[in-house]
Amino acid sequence: SQITGLEPGITYEYQAMAGTVAAKETKQFTTEAPAQLPNAGFEDWHGSSPLYIYKSGGEMFWDSGNTGSDTMNKNVTTYDATIKHSGNYSAKLQSQYVALFGIGAFAAGNVFVGKFLKIDGTDGILRFGRPFTSRPSKLVLYYRYVAGTVDYSTLSELPKNSKDMGSIYIALGDWPHQTFEGETDIPVLVKTKPADRQLFDSNSSNVIGYGECILKESTEGEGLIKLEIPINYRSNRKPTDIILVGSASRYGDYFTGSTGSTLWLDDLELIYE
């Protein structure tokens, strides 16, 4: 059974009941502290080539594919001062074909909790995840999505001339930490190079809670709309890390999607019930 309506960060006492008779022993439990995501309104940015999603001198929590696309003189993820929910900016994730001197690849507009670690040719090696120990019940955010027509494809599941799809997913887990070239405590190491591909697995036994929304249609109008993504828990274990990814092209890791796809995100909030 599940109890709702409890206040976060509060210690409660309870007694077991046998019919109408209460047990003599009283026990306690403490509800989760309502931890939130840093820079969840995407107000803080710095740099230009590449553009980073945190203020100068601050601590990185979010990153994007800009480190990779910058080698081709483009940022796939930028801020937008015109299409937003509140504050000064939203994050604008715009899928593009990035090329320089005839060499290039399709790159999905994306944002993720973690860090872009290394460029490997036209591919990337990424850290997914940051420390996080709470158990939110859902993710609430505001978004706008424009789904373009697929013009780059390596997958039969999403061929050229079909409609692109975006995605937003969140995972809480207790992944064994890895190390890569000086970067320590990596929850999930992602490699997009086809010969060495290593992607996030939502079915991993280390995933404690997971929620996802696949964006199959463009949203109506030019404003952002509210979206709630429930987080389904598979275990009562306490997580050690959080992963959150938004992408204008769901299959961008396979260099598949549309250069006409754009996803705006703003005001992400974790809800505790």
Spans of features found by a protein language model:
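Beta-strand-rich extracellular modules
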Residues: 17-21, 247-249
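Surface-exposed, short loops/turns at beta-strand junctions within beta-sandwich domains
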Residues: 3-10
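Short carbohydrate-recognition loop motifs
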Residues: 81-101
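Extracellular carbohydrate recognition
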Residues: 250-272
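Extracellular carbohydrate-recognition regions
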Residues: 26-71
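Extracellular carbohydrate recognition and processing domains
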Residues: 177-239, 258
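Extracellular-facing segments of soluble proteins and assemblies that are Gly/Ser/Thr-biased and enriched
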Residues: 102-181
